[in-house]
Amino acid sequence: MSKTNKLYKETSPYLLQHSENPVDWHPWTEQSLKKARTMNKPILLSIGYSACHWCHVMAHESFESDAIADVMNKHFFNIKVDREERPDIDQIYQIAHQIITQRPGGWPLTMFLDPKNNQPFF
């Protein structure tokens, strides 16, 4: 059996596509956010959707790499969000991206969040 991360029980096709990545992905849940706070690790938030071409490219080039996953797992609490399942979360961080960069966002969207308040930092 393949090694899986915390996404293997999800119903979203997009999240399930990432359930066997070496990245230790977690879904966006209160339990996951609480664990990130307890561990005091910054959150690496990745938002995308199953029909997104560039999301698949990023997954193949980054999230399937053991070397990149090792760095992500060591330094971050990794959370993956399907924008089609959680448009509320997507909207919050797309707006935050636009405010921070003065440019519209897109997908995949990667943000670094403070685990204490889920606010982006850069």
Predicted regions and their residues:
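Replace the tail clause
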Residues: 1-122
